[in-house]
């Protein structure tokens, strides 16, 4: 069978009278052929894999944020092939076009057995530009090769791990995420998720170690409402980030009330040129988001 998608995104974000973001671009355009054992997709698409939800070691080609009610992610211009030779085995291959007109390529194998679900991923990128990888915005200098393994076990408690090595001619990044989730029998079920990330970034003659901890709790209230809370901590810098959202979802629209408590702007030990000029994203914030689906 053959299908396709074409969609546009137009976005303007304001903070007071300051324009923070203005985007008007294609969001997706792709053509796909698929059958029971094979899928080929070509065009601007999303490529997402891995088991983590908050501290995502394998966020190589996407910008998914679990705190974003829209759930959109940036795409890549790529040819992606997937094979399904067995019900518990799949193979991915891709070629991605970068913004500086170079081609990167890679692949992934996924399989499951009695002790869990496994994934093995490889990718190489010859681009010489500085690249930002994962939800923590790790910087990689120069062309690089990436190796990763991820695992998930679903039992009484869900457990998962993502581990990756990103090696370039100027830097070496080793990242690991450990996570677990459990549903408490409270009301309709309180889902608790905790993740820990350890990251070591070696570039030139310097080494930087970072550690992060994240906790997410969510509970549905009937079939319409849901409350979600996320707290993250940068352990080395002792900074806390808190997020609370009440969502109400109806047939054609949803309403989201969001409260954030982030460190104040004055607590960051960075030059002003590395911080955006608006106060949005610092201190305490309140947001109301209306989403219409048609």
Where are these regions (language model features)?
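Signature for the C-terminal beta-barrel architecture of outer-membrane proteins
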Residues: 1-2, 34-37, 66-207
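Gram-negative outer-membrane beta-barrel proteins
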Residues: 10-16, 48-52, 87, 100-102, ...
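Outer-membrane beta-barrel translocator domains and adjoining extracellular loop/strand segments
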Residues: 14-22, 53-59, 103-106, 130-138, ...
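Hydrophobic, lipid-facing positions within transmembrane beta-strands of outer-membrane proteins
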Residues: 24-29, 75-79, 103-107, 145-149, ...
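Outer-membrane beta-barrel "beta-signal"
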Residues: 81, 248, 253-261, 278-294
């Amino acid at each position: 069978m053959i299908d396709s998608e074409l969609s546009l995104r137009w976005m303007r974000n304001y903070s007071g009278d300051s324009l923070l973001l203005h985007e008007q671009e294609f969001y997706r355009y792709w053509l796909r052929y698929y059958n029971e054992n094979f899928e080929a997709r070509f065009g601007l698409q999303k490529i997402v894999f891995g088991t983590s939800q908050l501290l995502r070691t394998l966020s190589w080609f996407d910008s998914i944020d679990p705190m974003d009610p829209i759930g959109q992610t940036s795409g890549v211009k790529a040819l992606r092939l997937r094979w399904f030779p067995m019900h518990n085995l799949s193979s991915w291959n891709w070629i991605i076009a970068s913004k500086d007109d170079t081609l990167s390529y890679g692949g992934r194998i996924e399989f499951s057995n009695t002790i869990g679900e496994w994934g093995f991923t490889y990718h190489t990128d010859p681009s010489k530009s500085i690249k930002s990888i994962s939800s923590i915005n790790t910087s990689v200098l120069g062309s690089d090769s990436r190796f990763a393994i991820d695992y998930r076990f679903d039992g009484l408690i869900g457990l998962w791990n993502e581990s990756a090595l990103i090696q370039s001619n100027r830097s070496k990044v080793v990242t690991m995420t450990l996570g677990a989730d459990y549903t408490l029998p409270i009301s309709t079920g309180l889902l608790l998720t905790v993740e820990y990330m350890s990251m070591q970034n070696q570039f030139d003659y310097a080494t930087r170690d970072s550690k992060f901890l994240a906790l997410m709790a969510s509970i549905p209230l009937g079939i319409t409402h849901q409350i979600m809370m996320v707290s993250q901590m940068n352990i080395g810098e002792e900074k806390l980030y808190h997020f609370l959202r009440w969502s109400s979802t109806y047939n054609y629209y949803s309403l989201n009330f969001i409260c954030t408590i982030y460190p104040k702007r004055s607590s960051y030990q960075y030059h002003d040129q590395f911080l955006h000029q608006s106060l949005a994203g610092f201190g305490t914030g309140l947001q109301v988001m209306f989403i219409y689906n048609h």
